[in-house]
């Protein structure tokens, strides 16, 4: 998925700036997605939706952390997902709540999919283009093989994009998926 790169941000200010800059490339009202943040980017290592709400009070935002085990969603994204203080934690995940019982926006493990599952699906062409970009990134680091560490495998669009890359000779790494 195309997203704002948050790797190495180091602070909330940098995360906010990168998200705002990225949002300018999107159509009005579309989701703002980012990835790569670290807990240490937030004061007291406490990620909270309010840091996103300040710059996006009316537009849904979700950012995945660097290791993929949690996501931070702003208030509009939580509202679209129907996440409230009364929401039950999903199996294999949990919704972080503040002392007042309200969701903080931090969604751990499977709870992240409550919001990320609302993102529009990518077409095969979009997925293939993203794959090509990521293969270029992998090559820049000298990587020659990659493994999907998830237990769910690839989506249909992702599988089709990988097959297209293999058929067109643009798959520059060995790839293993469950």
Question: Where are the model-predicted features located?
Answer:
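Divalent metal-binding segments
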Residues: 1-178
């Amino acid at each position: 998925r195309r997203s704002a790169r948050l790797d190495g941000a180091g602070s909330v200010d940098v995360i906010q700036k990168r998200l705002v800059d990225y949002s300018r490339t999107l159509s009005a009202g579309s989701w703002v997605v980012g990835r790569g943040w670290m807990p240490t980017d937030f004061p007291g290592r406490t990620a909270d939706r309010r840091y996103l709400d300040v710059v996006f009070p009316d537009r849904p935002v979700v950012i995945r952390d660097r290791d993929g085990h949690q996501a931070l969603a702003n208030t509009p994204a939580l509202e679209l997902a129907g996440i409230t203080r009364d929401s039950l934690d999903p199996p294999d995940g949990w919704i972080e709540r503040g002392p007042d019982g309200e969701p903080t926006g931090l969604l751990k493990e499977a709870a992240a999919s409550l919001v990320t599952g609302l993102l529009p699906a990518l077409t095969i062409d979009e997925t293939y283009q993203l794959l090509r970009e990521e293969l270029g990134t992998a090559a820049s680091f000298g990587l020659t093989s990659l493994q999907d560490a998830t237990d769910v495998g690839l989506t249909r669009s992702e599988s089709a994009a990988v097959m297209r890359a293999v058929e067109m000779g643009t798959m520059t790494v060995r790839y293993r998926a469950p």
